[in-house]
């Protein structure tokens, strides 16, 4: 009898232990298999479920390097999703990088998903799908700090996608049409669309959002039939598909240069790619530095292309023609810029007298790469265009500290602002869905420019990325100043209100959607958390000047 009672007691204790352990490990069942995650706490100490390192595609290695992603196969055992995957193979492009600039792995196509504890919750939550920036060359979805977003009732998703030549090499033919990185994003989006219901997310309320190359990627998903129907709205932060750095020129020429650097024959595309597929990934990544003429400029040697070959292109026409032809996905869109976008990449040299002097002495040679017109202005006009731009923005005298503000404005206008207005105007004119625009000029205690410059704390204004990084970057978002905390919450409210309701709300400010027929450009100016207002500008980004430069870009057929 005693042994029987003991057996019951042990059985009961075992059941309790099993139940407790089971409760400590959140689980979901998806179409590709069961997943076990773990619990984390948000910034305000709210418990949420974390599932990190979920594969959404098969590993693109060996003969699958440079090829479109392949859907992930089902797994039979429970997948332990408690650790982030490796970042994608990349060449780091920041002054803070010391020693080896190459890091990552080709086996990197993974998703991280975060969701408030479900507790048998029935209403499905809106989903925010983050696409990281990094000039299509570096960074990772792993860097996204979700803890602030997990104070809200949304599901947060961050992805990795192939970068640099691994994600954006193009031979301009059937062998490697290109856009593998964008196709990775689309496959990840499809996996989320098909499986997010298991995590408590609503597949019909997915908001894609991204910054810089991530913002341009968001815009590209509006333009691709591959992604149509997989999301409900989007936010492009500091990047659109019209930006010069978001459209790769002379891609086959760059592919051959990479082949030559890897000592592969370049007279036969198929044999060149076979050779490149046999070369060590780290050596290929290291070669990205050979495509940058001055410092890290141009900063996007490998990026999106128009695919003229292949049976399943991501895009087969230029972004401007896709929109103008009415082939753009018609759902709401928000796009905005910050006041000093050009601090990327100007922060690398504006605090350095030696580099400014070098820029002064070699302006005519450097300008086509710094301002990304090397391929869109004929070679015999490079010097003339470089001088014209310099005379307008920098006037007379040497390039030195006195010209820093003008340099930043010049780079902001050319690389971000001009094409931002052009893109939102055209999309608002073609689509029925609303387009909202904003301009952000709040400088927090810390800035991305500190990272880009290698530690300089000089206040040159609001840098590219300062807005989103105040909410998503572990270093910058860990703020204590009351003003920064207030702005942080305002931005979180902005992003999540759009995801939840489909209309952006910023502290009760009046924010009408863009009227594309208005000759003046109107946008919401976020000055600080108490000063938010609509502004009008009839010469935004000095567009009257830039119209005089004959760039072979964003031309209608």
Curated annotation (Swiss-Prot):
Compartments, record wording: Secreted
Organism phylogeny: Eukaryota, Metazoa, Ecdysozoa, Arthropoda, Hexapoda
Active site per UniProt: 212, 341, 464
Predominant cellular place of this UniProt entry's protein: secreted
Residue positions the entry lists as glycosylated: 145, 374, 478, 528, 542
A GO CC term attached to the entry: extracellular region
Cited PROSITE patterns: CARBOXYLESTERASE_B_1, CARBOXYLESTERASE_B_2
Name under which the protein is recorded: Venom carboxylesterase-6
EC number: 3.1.1.1
């Amino acid at each position: 009898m005693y042994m029987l009672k003991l057996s019951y007691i042990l059985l009961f204790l075992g059941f309790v232990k099993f139940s407790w352990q089971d409760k400590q490990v959140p689980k979901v069942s998806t179409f590709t298999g069961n997943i076990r995650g773990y619990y984390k706490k948000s910034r305000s100490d709210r418990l949420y479920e974390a599932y990190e390192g979920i594969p959404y595609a098969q590993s693109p290695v060996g003969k699958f390097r440079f090829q479109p992603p392949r859907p992930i196969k089902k797994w039979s055992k429970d997948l332990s999703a408690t650790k982030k995957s490796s970042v994608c193979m990349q060449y780091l492009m920041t002054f803070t990088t010391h020693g080896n600039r190459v890091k990552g792995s080709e086996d990197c196509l993974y998703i991280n998903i975060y969701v408030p504890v479900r507790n048998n919750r029935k209403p499905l939550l809106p989903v925010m799908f983050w696409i990281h920036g990094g000039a299509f060359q570096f960074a990772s979805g792993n860097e996204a700090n979700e803890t602030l977003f997990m104070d809200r009732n949304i599901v947060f998703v961050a992805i990795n996608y192939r970068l640099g030549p691994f994600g954006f090499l193009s031979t301009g033919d059937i062998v490697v049409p290109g856009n593998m990185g964008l196709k990775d994003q689309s496959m990840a989006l499809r996996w989320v669309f098909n499986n997010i219901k298991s995590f408590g997310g609503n597949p019909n309320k997915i908001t894609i959002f991204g910054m810089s190359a991530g913002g341009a990627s968001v815009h590209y998903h509006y333009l691709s039939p591959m992604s149509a129907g997989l999301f409900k709205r989007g936010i492009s932060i500091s990047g659109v598909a019209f930006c010069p750095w978001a459209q790769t020129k002379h891609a086959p020429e760059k592919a051959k240069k990479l082949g030559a650097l890897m000592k592969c024959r370049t007279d036969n595309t198929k044999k060149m790619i076979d050779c490149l597929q046999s070369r060590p990934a780290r050596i290929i990544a290291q070669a990205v530095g050979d495509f940058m003429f001055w410092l890290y400029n141009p900063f996007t040697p490998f990026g999106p292309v128009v695919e003229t070959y292949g049976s399943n292109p991501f895009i087969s026409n230029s972004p401007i023609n896709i929109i103008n032809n009415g082939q753009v996905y018609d759902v709401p869109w928000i796009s905005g810029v910050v006041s000093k976008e050009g601090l990327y990449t100007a922060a690398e040299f504006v605090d350095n007298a030696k580099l400014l002097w070098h820029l002064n002495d070699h302006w005519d040679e450097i300008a086509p790469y710094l301002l990304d017109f090397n391929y869109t202005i004929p070679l015999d006009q490079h010097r003339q265009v470089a001088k014209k731009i310099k005379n307008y923005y920098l006037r007379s005298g040497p390039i030195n500290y006195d010209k820093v503000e003008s340099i930043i404005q010049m780079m902001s206008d050319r690389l971000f602002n001009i094409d931002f207005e052009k893109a939102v105007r055209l999309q608002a004119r073609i689509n029925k869905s609303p387009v909202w625009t904003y301009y952000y000029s709040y400088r927090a205690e810390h800035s991305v420019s500190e990272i880009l410059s290698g530690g300089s704390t000089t206040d040159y204004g609001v840098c590219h990325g300062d807005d989103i990084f105040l909410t998503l970057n572990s270093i910058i978002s860990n703020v204590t100043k009351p003003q920064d905390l207030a702005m942080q919450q305002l931005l979180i409210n902005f992003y999540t209100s759009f995801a939840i309701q489909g209309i952006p709300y910023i502290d009760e400010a009046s924010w009408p959607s863009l009227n594309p027929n208005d000759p003046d450009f109107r946008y919401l100016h976020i000055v600080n958390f108490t000063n938010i207002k609509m502004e009008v500008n009839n010469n935004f980004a000095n567009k009257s000047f830039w119209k005089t430069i004959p760039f072979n870009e964003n031309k209608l057929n």
